[in-house]
């Protein structure tokens, strides 16, 4: 796995490795399981889980985790939940976890008990939108998640919602007006939301985008806003398997594993040359090529967007701040991508061979780099979910 982009929203980046829940190889027994900072009841449950046969699976988080979270440690294991963690949905100051038993747990600045039987959620700093039973509900964050929902839409028989933000007849957002319509003829496999734009993956692998386009995040070649879903013509004819939206950038993965990026590259989140990052590097570092890490393409890739203005005095380097149409990204060793996710100003991708993530430094980067944390700990990455300023990774022992 590799990551690119902005390392932290401010100076708040926590990068020193800290593993609270070690994953032990199969056959080591419960005596070797340590559970620091965990209540005894949950620690006992963890010991029982770790004693079960078969490879163990867990979620890890890198980067900013909310003001209520302890600082220190670049890699932190997310505390396991009974029934396992089925979904991870990060917001800026907190994260929502949906367990295999339909329970919703909130971690970070916002914590509280919400109704059970949750299938999915969309968090934001103003509301938490839930798919619960046969209804869509929006709960106001400012009320401390008490009382009833601020908005509710019951699903009629035969209607199905999800994966969120998809909903019957359109899509939902975790802020008013909550429900937005889509053209009836437009079918969707997946829909993702950026700060000011949306991207939709159709059944045939086509990609549609709409919303604000001032940073090139729509991929139509211009910077004008688009009010209705429009086909990204540059990708037409190449079936896509996945799509992701960052704050002001977009990424898609073809069925063959190729990675396409477009939009804002100020922090190198597109893995294209960034003038802003080049100016921050020491002169020697800017002129000397970085040595390639062994097996760099074998895992999760963190992507960063770079500035598009030409740099005065730069030698043979074209900097990119805005990429207004999809660009095919060459990953090291020709790696094929299986999954991709975007944060506010960073991108992470899991390759089909292995998966790694989590650079042990707070500096931004506009180069795809393998994350050595997971192979060093005998783990293979299965999934990745980016929050605005962090990255959650699901990994299993090899």
Please report, for each region that a protein language model flagged, where it lies by residue.
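Conserved core positions of repeat-based scaffolds
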Residues: 61, 94-97, 106, 127-130, ...
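Conserved strand-to-loop turn within each blade of WD40 beta-propeller repeats
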Residues: 195, 203-204, 212-214, 247-248, ...
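Canonical WD40 repeat/beta-propeller blade segments in eukaryotic WD-repeat proteins
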Residues: 85, 118-119, 187-190, 196, ...
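Short glycine/serine- and acidic-residue-enriched loop/turn motifs that recur at repeat junctions
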Residues: 2-4, 24, 35-87, 98, ...
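Blade-level signature of beta-propeller repeat domains, shared across WD40, Kelch, NHL, RCC1
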Residues: 372-398
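Short loop/turn positions that demarcate and connect the beta-strands within blades
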Residues: 82, 90, 115, 185, ...
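Surface loop/turn motifs at the tips and blade-to-blade linkers of beta-strand repeat domains
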Residues: 78-81, 111-115, 180-183, 233-235, ...
């Amino acid at each position: 796995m590799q990551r690119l982009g902005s390392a932290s929203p401010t100076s708040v980046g926590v990068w020193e490795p800290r593993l609270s829940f070690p994953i032990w190889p199969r056959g080591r027994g419960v005596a070797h399981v340590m559970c620091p900072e965990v209540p005894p009841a949950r620690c006992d449950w963890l010991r029982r889980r770790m004693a079960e046969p078969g490879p163990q699976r867990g979620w890890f988080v890198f980067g900013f985790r909310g003001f209520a979270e302890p600082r220190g440690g670049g890699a932190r294991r997310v505390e396991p939940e009974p029934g396992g963690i089925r979904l991870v949905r990060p917001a800026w100051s907190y994260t929502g976890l949906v367990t295999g038993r339909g329970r919703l747990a909130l971690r970070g600045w916002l914590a509280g008990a919400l109704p059970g039987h949750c299938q999915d959620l969309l968090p934001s700093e103003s509301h938490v939108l839930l798919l619960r039973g046969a209804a869509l509900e929006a709960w106001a964050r400012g009320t401390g998640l008490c009382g009833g929902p601020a908005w509710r839409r019951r699903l009629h028989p035969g209607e199905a919602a999800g994966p969120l933000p998809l909903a019957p007849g359109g899509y939902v957002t975790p802020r008013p007006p909550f429900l937005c319509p889509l053209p009836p003829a437009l079918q969707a496999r997946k829909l993702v939301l950026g700060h000011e734009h949306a991207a939709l993956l159709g059944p045939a692998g086509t990609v549609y985008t709409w919303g604000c386009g001032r940073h090139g995040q729509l991929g139509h070649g211009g910077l004008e806003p688009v009010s209705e879903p429009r086909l990204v013509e540059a990708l037409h004819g190449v079936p896509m398997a996945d799509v992701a939206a960052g704050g002001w950038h977009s990424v898609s993965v073809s069925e063959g594993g190729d990675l396409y990026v477009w939009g804002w590259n100020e922090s190198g989140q597109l893995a294209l040359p960034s003038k802003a990052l080049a100016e921050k590097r020491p002169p020697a570092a800017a002129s000397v090529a970085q040595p390639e890490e062994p097996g760099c393409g074998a895992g999760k890739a963190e992507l960063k967007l770079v500035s598009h203005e030409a740099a005065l005095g730069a030698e043979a380097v074209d900097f990119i701040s805005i990429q207004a149409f999809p660009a095919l990204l060459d990953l090291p060793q020709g790696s094929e991508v299986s999954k991709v996710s975007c944060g506010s100003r960073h991108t992470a991708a899991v390759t089909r061979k292995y998966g790694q993530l989590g650079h042990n430094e707070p500096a931004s980067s506009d180069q795809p780099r393998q994350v050595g944390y997971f192979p060093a700990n005998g783990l293979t990455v299965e999934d990745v979910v980016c929050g605005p300023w962090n990255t959650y990774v699901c990994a299993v022992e090899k």
